[in-house]
Every structure is written in structure tokens, then in C-alpha cells.
């Protein structure tokens, strides 16, 4: 399918390309995935600034939506991907493939970082549904925070950045910018 982006989509793609730490807060159905994939395509296959991208998403979105979006759009032809869901053996096999984009469900972030035995050598991380990282006490948050300094580029995607109020924002932004905007410690933010 031919991609004819709206102005806001072009703006968001350009923002991701120009800012190594970015977030796209758009309602469902407004094209967060294609916006991000367009930027990934450019970073991986045009400017060669990124070699490996990790997309973290809810299980169904990781298994179905991201692969469908990559296959759907003509301008993304050539962008290779692997979906790392399922059993441990299936996830490892998917993560060992030589592709540009690795898609994993958020429940397996801790496994990937701490237990998989694979190096965390992703240049770019995309967190689809950033609000699922709102708890600073969650294992997935802590695991991702450990490897965050190794990541050159990160993008957070969500339609509901503060689903339960402003306290939810701290952990989401801590993972994105390592505490630059809202501080490194939750007690100070409170």
C-alpha cells in the first residue's frame, strides 16, 4: 500500500529522526507504528545510523500489528524483522536472526536483559505503549533501565501518557531520557 503521510505524521517522523530521545503521543489509529517504522527505515537503510532496533510491545501487538505494518507499506520494502514471542527456544531463534528490527513482547524484557544469555546490542529501542512502563518498581522497568545507557536512540509510543495522573510520567520519562527532564529519583519528583 502506498504511504501518503499527513503533515503531523511527517512532522513526527522528522522529530524521531532529529531527536535520539523522542516520544510520540497520538491516539489509537493515528499511525504511531508507520511513523516510527518510516523513521526506522531511514535510520537503518538510508542514513545507516542504526544497525539493530528492538521494538517492545504488548504481546498481541508484537505478534500481529508490527509485522503487519511492516508488510503493509510499500515504502518499507527491504526492512527485515523477526518476532521474538513464544517459547524460550522460539524467542532465542528469532533474536539470533540477522535482521534490522527485532520485535518482542513487554513481558519478556527482563528475560532478554537478564536471562537470555544474548548480548543487548540494540542501537535503538521503541517502546510501544510506553504507559506499560509507568511503574518504577516493575521488573521490566528495572531491567530496561540497566541497559538503557547502551541504547543510542529510544522512542516511546502511547496514546495515554499519564493514564492515572502525573505520577505515572516519572518512570516513563526516566526510561526515555535517563532522568534528564523529571529527575533521576522518584522521591525528588514527588
Predicted regions and their residues:
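Short, functionally important structural connectors and interaction interfaces within domains
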Residues: 20, 139, 158, 167-168
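Short charge-dense sequence patches
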Residues: 93, 123-127, 159-169
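Conserved helicase ATPase motor motifs in RecA-like P-loop NTPase domains
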Residues: 28-29, 151-167, 174
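PAPS/PAP-binding and catalytic site of the sulfotransferase fold
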Residues: 37, 69, 165-176
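SF2 helicase/translocase NTPase motor core
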Residues: 1-26, 30-140, 146-150, 181-190
Amino acid at each position: 500500500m502506498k504511504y501518503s503521510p499527513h503533515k503531523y505524521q511527517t512532522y513526527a517522523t522528522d522529530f524521531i529522526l532529529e531527536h535520539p530521545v523522542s516520544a510520540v503521543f497520538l491516539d489509537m489509529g493515528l499511525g504511531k507504528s508507520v511513523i516510527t517504522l518510516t523513521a526506522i527505515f531511514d535510520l537503518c537503510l538510508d542514513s545507516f545510523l542504526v544497525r539493530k532496533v528492538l521494538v517492545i510491545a504488548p504481546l498481541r501487538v508484537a505478534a500481529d500489528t508490527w509485522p503487519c505494518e511492516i508488510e503493509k507499506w510499500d515504502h518499507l520494502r527491504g526492512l527485515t524483522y523477526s518476532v521474538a514471542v513464544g517459547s524460550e527456544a522460539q524467542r532465542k531463534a528469532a533474536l539470533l536472526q540477522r535482521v534490522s528490527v527485532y520485535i518482542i513482547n513487554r513481558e519478556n524484557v527482563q528475560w532478554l536483559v537478564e536471562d537470555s544469555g544474548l548480548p543487548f546490542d540494540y542501537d535503538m529501542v521503541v517502546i510501544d505503549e510506553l504507559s506499560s512502563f509507568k511503574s518504577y518498581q516493575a521488573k521490566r522497568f528495572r531491567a530496561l533501565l540497566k541497559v538503557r545507557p547502551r541504547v543510542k536512540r529510544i522512542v516511546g509510543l502511547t496514546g495515554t501518557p499519564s493514564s492515572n495522573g502525573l505520577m505515572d510520567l516519572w518512570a516513563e520519562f526516566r526510561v526515555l531520557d535517563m532522568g534528564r527532564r523529571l529527575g533521576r529519583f522518584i522521591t525528588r519528583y514527588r
